[in-house]
Amino acid sequence: MNNPSETSKPSMESGDGNTGTQTNGLDFQKQPVPVGGAISTAQAQAFLGHLHQVQLAGTSLQAAAQSLNVQSKSNEESGDSQQPSQPSQQPSVQAAIPQTQLMLAGGQITGLTLTPAQQQLLLQQAQAQAQLLAAAVQQHSASQQHSAAGATISASAATPMTQIPLSQPIQIAQDLQQLQQLQQQNLNLQQFVLVHPTTNLQPAQFIISQTPQGQQGLLQAQNLLTQLPQQSQANLLQSQPSITLTSQPATPTRTIAATPIQTLPQSQSTPKRIDTPSLEEPSDLEELEQFAKTFKQRRIKLGFTQGDVGLAMGKLYGNDFSQTTISRFEALNLSFKNMCKLKPLLEKWLNDAENLSSDSSLSSPSALNSPGIEGLSRRRKKRTSIETNIRVALEKSFLENQKPTSEEITMIADQLNMEKEVIRVWFCNRRQKEKRINPPSSGGTSSSPIKAIFPSPTSLVATTPSLVTSSAATTLTVSPVLPLTSAAVTNLSVTGTSDTTSNNTATVISTAPPASSAVTSPSLSPSPSASASTSEASSASETSTTQTTSTPLSSPLGTSQVMVTASGLQTAAAAALQGAAQLPANASLAAMAAAAGLNPSLMAPSQFAAGGALLSLNPGTLSGALSPALMSNSTLATIQALASGGSLPITSLDATGNLVFANAGGAPNIVTAPLFLNPQNLSLLTSNPVSLVSAAAASAGNSAPVASLHATSTSAESIQNSLFTVASASGAASTTTTASKAQ
């Protein structure tokens, strides 16, 4: 710790006017005294006075030397706490000078930052003090009068400097020569620069130059810095940019150039700074934030997703990163350490991606398929736009088949000149849209029960394929249609009980898809004699709709006639016509009309379509069966009603598609309600709503039994099935049995 050259800098820092202080330069005020190569007697006296004020108030230089030794030892102990391995060896007589210098250098422990001009001035002042100290030691060793001379100097120090006489002249040249000799003898001592105590320093972190000149020492220290590991130097320059190399250019002794290095545990192993000073972190965070923002903008401009970046980095650099990691990096949600780790990799990938995107070879198939480029070339797929005409064709295909097979999708794609994957995705999306529009719970299937179209106070029983019979006077029960795949003639029974009412109601029932309301009747009021139900019996695309209504008539219904024209149904073997008359399968229309008890003049045979049949359902023959020979082949058609007695001619209802019940108004026991099935006017029964209109023309005071109409329209593989039944009852309940031929 003995430092003959270092003492020159802090020695003048204790030269202030504070007379009572004995600290090691901690409380001081610099008072630079301009001196040249030689000093005057007055300046020497002033320096001695300042030194006397700092050290002690005695009158003897011997006592001063002793106090200097004590303070220098305490300073050495404080200095050894930071640098414990420093030697302090000096001769007993010559130890006073370096010890005193080291004591005076205590003011530098606080690491004051001095300008070059201040350093030069302190060096000059230190030289002058060193000369005075050398002369004092020489005089002390020569004679015992040294004490008296010291007392004279200390006494004269209190007087103004202009009036101080020097009792013993000091030979400046000899003193300088002696000082140089002493310094040359102490060249083997280590010399250090004391810096701020908050800086953690280690002895191995000082760089000592052995050149005698200050400027050469500075250059040597810079050369030594360049020989440090590159990682440590990067840490040094980043963590301590304000630390500069210091030197003592004016001293002829060894100069010191020391640069403290911030202690970093991982500075030798990783090129990234883990623990950085708090003053430098904001700039690094700002740099990372700016890079993250720039990276996101450039990535989007290139058309890559965050997942593409992670995949490409895994293929190119061997480090797989997820989309979440890239997203958190762009949002600055990663730790500082991970951000620093990702930044160089992302920066490298970004540069490579930009270079590849700008390269013309990227557009060639060979470049796209080359290793390492796959991750970079995978761009975000654009949204497919489908033209209107193609969309209409797809909608039509969807209505036909909602879930086509792979082969059907391929055929559709070839027809529309579209990609198969696009067609497949469109069908998937369209099915999801259909589920949102029509949830599965709202649609009926073959296993769904019969649902009431409108609420009614009368009890409506949802039936199964078995026969359901109700004995209540105000209840109408309907059995649903049997499965449409049945080929045998089956008897279906519709049972109703008659009742009397005092008013007439007009009922309108429109057939419609089962999912929607199929009853529109502003004049229909829920009554004991009116009810409706719908049964949905479907297999694949088959649909069956059953509608039942009861309309009161003003007079007893004596005879009902049904005329059926069908040109598409295949006849099946069944029982012959029973009751009033039995006809062969090839009976003519006139014979059938006569057997039915219908006047041929009411409906001429020429009005019947080819293969038509006229049926008679008398109250006495309601238990009979209809021969399938009376029902020829025809598609489903609309129902028209003809008024008895010619009040409504047949031709007047050809274009309306309505079924009209009307009273004859004449003899109550002779009422006919013929039904005419016209295939030309009623060919859209299963696709468009068809009305069944019931109207009464009699007075409101007449009483009449209830006539029940059971109309069932089915849509099977092709629209070819129909079943129409009219049941009337007078008095007791009777059963009407009809035959239905189903494909």
Curated annotation (Swiss-Prot):
Superkingdom to which the source organism belongs: Eukaryota
One Gene Ontology cellular component annotation held by this UniProt entry: nucleoplasm
Tissue: Ubiquitous. Isoform 2 is lymphocyte-specific.
Effect of S385A: Loss of inhibition of DNA binding
Region (Disordered): 1-34, 67-95, 258-283, 357-381, 494-557
PROSITE patterns assigned to the protein according to its UniProt record, in alphabetical order: HOMEOBOX_1, HOMEOBOX_2, POU_1, POU_2, POU_3
Residues that bear Phosphothreonine: T270, T276
Pfam families, alphabetized: Homeodomain, Pou, POU2F1_C
Compositionally biased spans, kind Low complexity: 81-95, 357-371, 505-557
Consequence of changing S88F: In a breast cancer sample; somatic mutation
Domain POU-specific: 280-354
GO molecular function terms attached to this record: DNA binding; DNA-binding transcription activator activity, RNA polymerase II-specific; DNA-binding transcription factor activity, RNA polymerase II-specific; identical protein binding; RNA polymerase II cis-regulatory region sequence-specific DNA binding; RNA polymerase II core promoter sequence-specific DNA binding; sequence-specific DNA binding
Compositionally biased region (Polar residues): 1-11, 494-504
InterPro entries membership: HD (IPR001356), Homeobox_CS (IPR017970), Homeodomain-like_sf (IPR009057), Lambda_DNA-bd_dom_sf (IPR010982), POU (IPR013847), POU2F1_C (IPR045703), POU_dom (IPR000327), POU_domain_TF (IPR050255)
GO biological process: negative regulation of DNA-templated transcription; positive regulation of miRNA transcription; positive regulation of transcription by RNA polymerase II; regulation of transcription by RNA polymerase II
Keyword entries, A-Z: Activator, DNA-binding, Homeobox, Nucleus, Phosphoprotein, Transcription, Transcription regulation
Nucleus recorded as keyword: yes
Location in the cell: Nucleus
Residues modified to Phosphoserine: S283, S385, S448
Modification after translation (UniProt): Phosphorylated by PRKDC.
Key word Nucleus present: yes
Function: Transcription factor that binds to the octamer motif (5'-ATTTGCAT-3') and activates the promoters of the genes for some small nuclear RNAs (snRNA) and of genes such as those for histone H2B and immunoglobulins. Modulates transcription transactivation by NR3C1, AR and PGR.
Family under the similarity heading: Belongs to the POU transcription factor family. Class-2 subfamily.
Assembly information from the UniProt record: Interacts with POU2AF1; the interaction increases POU2F1 transactivation activity. Interacts with NR3C1, AR, PGR and HCFC1. (Microbial infection) Associates with the herpes simplex virus VP16-induced complex; binding to HCFC1 activates the viral transcriptional activator VP16 for association with POU2F1, to form a multiprotein-DNA complex responsible for activating transcription of the viral immediate early genes.
Protein name: POU domain, class 2, transcription factor 1
